[in-house]
Amino acid sequence: MPKDTSISSILVIGSGPIIIGQAAEFDYSGTQGCIALKEEGYRVILVNSNPATIMTDEAFADEIYFEPLTAESLTAIIKKERPDGLLANLGGQTALNLAVELEETGVLKEHGVKLLGTSVETIQKGEDREKFRSLMNELKQPVPESEIVDNEADALHFAESIGFPVIIRPAYTLGGKGGGIAPDKEAFTAMIKQALLASPINQCLVEKSIAGFKEIEYEVMRDSNNTCITVCNMENIDPVGVHTGDSIVVAPSQTLTDEDYQMLRTASLTIISALDVVGGCNIQFALDPFSKQYYVIEVNPRVSRSSALASKATGYPIAKMAAKLAVGYTLDELKNPLTGSTYASFEPALDYVIVKFPRWPFDKFKNADRKLGTKMKATGEVMAIERNLEAAIQKAAASLELKNIGTHLPELSGLSIDTLWDLAITPDDRRFFVVMELLSRSVSIDDIHEKTKIDPFFLHTFDNIIKLENRLMEAGSDLSFELLKKAKEKGFSDATIASLISKTEEEVRALRKEMGITPSFKIVDTCAAEFDAKTNYFYSTYFGETDGDISRKEKKRALIIGSGPIRIGQGVEFDYSAVHGVLTLQELGFETIMINNNPETVSTDYEIADRLYFEPMTTEHIVNVAEQENIDFAIVQFGGQTAINAAEALEKAGITLLGTSFQTLDVLEDRDQFYQLLDELGLKHAKGEIAYTKEEAASKASEIGYPVLIRPSYVIGGMGMIIVDSQAQLSQLLNDEDSMPYPILIDQYVSGKEVEIDLISDGEEVFIPTYTEHIERAGVHSGDSFAILPGPSITSGLQQGMKDAAQKIARKLSFKGIMNIQFVIDNGNILVLEVNPRASRTVPVVSKVMGVPMIPLATRLLAGASLKDLNPAVQNHHGVAVKFPVFSSHAIQDVDVKLGPEMKSTGEGMCVAYDSNSALKKIYTRVWSQKGSIYLQNVPEDVKELAENAGFTIHEGTFASWMEQEGNSLHINLSGSEEARKERLEAMTHGIPVFTEEETVRAFLQSGSGHPQPVSLKDLYKKEVASCTQ
């Protein structure tokens, strides 16, 4: 069936800012989908408020709207753009919920918009717990004993009738938001309130707990001809009870018999056919490990986190195919681009094993509740590919960028057996490492299985690693060829082996190469070598010979180092930079080699770089790839702190770094050298010192004068930063040795206006598209600040002063490429706060708002062009953008959103308008439309007057009485007290927006005069182009 020619324009709904449960995987799926639609000649209208994404670039859509993802906003865009079709199954839960709302309110019918792909009826059958259960009963597909409830009384009555523990699953939510396992009545009573609040239709499923069953997922595709295939099946190492996003996942499944596999495959195909899904669908099962009894847990009638994982695990482009199916194609009409010969109706086959390992934010949030359950808490994930499970597990662990040594966390070595058992039975993010610690202490596999319900197969796999560790320690420096080869085959890194035999990583590498033990590189081809595949997708292993032909061509080869897993401080914006670096290098005639390990991202789409290597971002693996490819140079400016941290080791390995030498990086990261540089250039900065001991820290803080800012070096996202107001507070902080990784930096804290610039330089001149002004004072991390660009109060004199400072720094360092500089304006004085010699998280924002392709320009400068050659210019526009932070308070409990120098937001959004008040008002559309009650604490009197003048009602009673009433719009709480923290957390758990900074409050209240209307990026630009003189 050919494509649908009755439609010519399609509205695509994106997933919005990154939050836990809905992250970079939707940029990958959305980008694939937009590319697929553009290939077919459709006009694509994209609505997505996330500026950090690839999909919101001009190349992927004809009109791009950074607008609130609300039904009201989409209705206005539909009236303006008059699309023929709407595609909602690429934008996660956000897009699905909006599609249902637009259908139910009659907007789609009124404006003649056809919902493409999966119908609203199908969405409701998958998402509405009552309709889902009814359909499963019709199909005779077993579901756990359950009850659909819409009030607390009915919920409690049912829970008590079936007995605790029970699982609570809210309808129309993602990442298990609002749900969980309630072990008893007390926990249930608290959880059911939050669960009903979390569901947009106030509906929950309360079901008998089947925690401890195996959790199995099938990723399935279906077309309009009812042709169905399973793309991939996956097995969670953690049993049912831990959200799949928080579980280590293996593909293909490892412990199912063929009968089990076929039984669940048949059930998957039955379900997707009955749902009438057109596109991709994820189906989750619970399987009794002691029988053939299974239950259907959940169906996601859309592309999902698991879809992205399945796509990267198999090489099958699920989102791209889903978009093509949505416009009428069938699976037997579409070719798999990875093989070039098989059709999309051909089920992938794997001759390797993949492991997905979640990445949690608890290295930043040490006091948060890290226990795992049915509510997802991971911010991102890594994926590893290997020929055996032991090696895949070890590669995945090496990809996490934690303080682990192989499969061990040093912090666990001092814990008692009883404490380790507690952590294993009631799991948190360290569970895998806890199990490895138990095994290393000779605890039996049977005991661990009995208490954790982890399948013995996986535990034996883990124990194989421990046994090989013991053999390596016994051998010591007398390491045989056979033992070293075995260790490498099982995934032991050079660094881990070095730690076991008391040698350096360099010594192990030299010994390995001397023995002729080097990796081979195998291809991912979707067909297990059954067909001749033209693939460029590789992974390393120590089995067999290298696949494919990578013989040297005439082109120079560039290695681009990616940014690894999504975590707070290093999000999808760095993938944006890496992808544009690759595309520009290709335009310039280079062969591009991408190394990364994040299955959610566009950069790990095999169609982006000339060759893709899915590998840990460690020195060993990066150097292995560089040697295999015989690269000419590497670029570390586009991969965030991950790539920057690899710079020294890469230079030592003889790899040329383009644009940024390690010496330059060291000058900017080491505070002593940095301040010496600024002093030499005559640039003002806050007073700062380095302290190597507790006593030195106390002495230097007193010398500088309070308040001071304390932080470690070489970090991103402000990790470990804190503002200290007094000697007493410092003493308390210094007594906590774990929080102070010496040496530490102690800077004078200056509370002024913060401004940042993203610039490009050829080593002589600099080009600055705009000056981004933070709304909050300095001291609030730039990633957590609201920011306006172009900055409205940055005078021409201040602009010139900042440009002069930037030019002095770039010339002194002979810096080429892209750089971010943060300034504080204090009583008219310009102080240099920080210089980041890499692409920053604001690069995508600046690029899109100002119409300047920052990364392509920076890449050309790295390749040898001058600014004079490029003559960059900003597009003349008559609008403004406001960037705003987004926090995942629904997932990470006990983390206060009181802003400070350590970043806490998981993502960012952006709204554009013709004035700043209108842009700001869009961010809080629902608050302004409601204009309900506000609770104020510790605010100036005139703020109260501003709120009343804006039409809000001020609650004069206690916080407790305010929380008992309905119609609450906003909690404004500027206090730093413990009571205030608890109040903020309670407000957030009820979905009430919270402001913690006076500057944000004032900007918000002033925005009431704005007049929001849909504004696309193209609407902002005029036809003529103006040269940038900043």
Swiss-Prot record:
Pathway: Amino-acid biosynthesis; L-arginine biosynthesis; carbamoyl phosphate from bicarbonate: step 1/1
Residue intervals of the ATP-grasp domain: 133-327, 675-863
Residues annotated for Mg(2+) 4 binding in this entry: 834, 836
Superkingdom field: Bacteria
Entry EC no(s): 6.3.4.16, 6.3.5.5
GO cellular component terms attached to this protein's record: cytoplasm
Entry binding sites for Mn(2+) 2: 298, 300
Record-listed Mn(2+) 1 binding positions: 284, 298
PROSITE patterns: ATP_GRASP, CPSASE_1, CPSASE_2, MGS
Residues holding Mn(2+) 4: 834, 836
Domain MGS-like span(s) in chain numbering: 925-1027
Region ranges (Carbamoyl phosphate synthetic domain): 549-928
Pfam families from the UniProt entry: CPSase_L_D2, CPSase_L_D3
Positions that bind ATP 1: 129, 169, 175-176, 208, 210, 215, 241-243, 284, 298
Described function: Large subunit of the glutamine-dependent carbamoyl phosphate synthetase (CPSase). CPSase catalyzes the formation of carbamoyl phosphate from the ammonia moiety of glutamine, carbonate, and phosphate donated by ATP, constituting the first step of the biosynthetic pathway leading to arginine and/or urea.
Protein name per UniProt: Carbamoyl phosphate synthase arginine-specific large chain
Species annotation: Bacillus subtilis (strain 168)
Source taxonomy: Bacteria, Bacillati, Bacillota, Bacilli, Bacillales
